[in-house]
């Protein structure tokens, strides 16, 4: 399921495809999601791995809500790969991907005009497919949310 899917007619694209839970059934990793980051342009074609925490998804939601021309939205970065989107104008965004171990690149994409609304829906779809099922009751202390069936 794609959390991010930015693509244009020139073949430039950046996709963050959520593939599942990182450690299903393990309290400390159950709510961490695995994702593939697919980046493609005339000068790059890469597949990278990313982990997304519930906090990453909340931060992404906040970034999308506040995004305006000249603004930025970011995802990840605390534990490795980071991705950012800068709104150049109403027709183009710059997407940067930084994986400290493998790749740093920036590409320009001209997404459809309603891409932010579409991505709010994508975030909701991801949250519905993999709902939060663990709560941190104290620093480094976790419990299943009541009514969770593990």
Residue ranges and their predicted role:
Residues 30-69:
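Short, well-structured hydrophobic secondary-structure segments
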Residues 27-34, 77-103:
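Intrinsic, low-complexity N-terminal interaction/targeting segments
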Residues 21-26, 68-88, 134-148:
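DNA polymerase processivity clamps
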């Amino acid at each position: 399921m794609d959390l991010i899917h930015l693509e244009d007619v020139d073949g430039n694209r950046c996709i963050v495809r959520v593939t599942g839970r990182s450690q299903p059934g393990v309290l400390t990793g159950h709510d961490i999601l695995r994702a593939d980051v697919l980046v493609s342009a005339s000068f790059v074609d890469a597949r990278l791995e990313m982990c997304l925490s519930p906090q990453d998804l909340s931060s992404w939601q906040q970034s999308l809500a506040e995004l305006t021309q000249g603004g930025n939205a970011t995802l990840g970065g605390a534990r490795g790969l980071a991705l950012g989107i800068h709104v150049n104008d109403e027709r183009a965004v710059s997407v940067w991907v930084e994986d400290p171990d493998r790749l740093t690149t920036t590409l320009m994409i001209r997404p459809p005009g309603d891409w932010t609304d579409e991505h709010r829906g994508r975030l909701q779809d991801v949250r519905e497919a993999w709902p939060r099922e663990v709560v941190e009751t104290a620093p480094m202390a976790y419990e299943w949310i009541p009514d969770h069936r593990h």
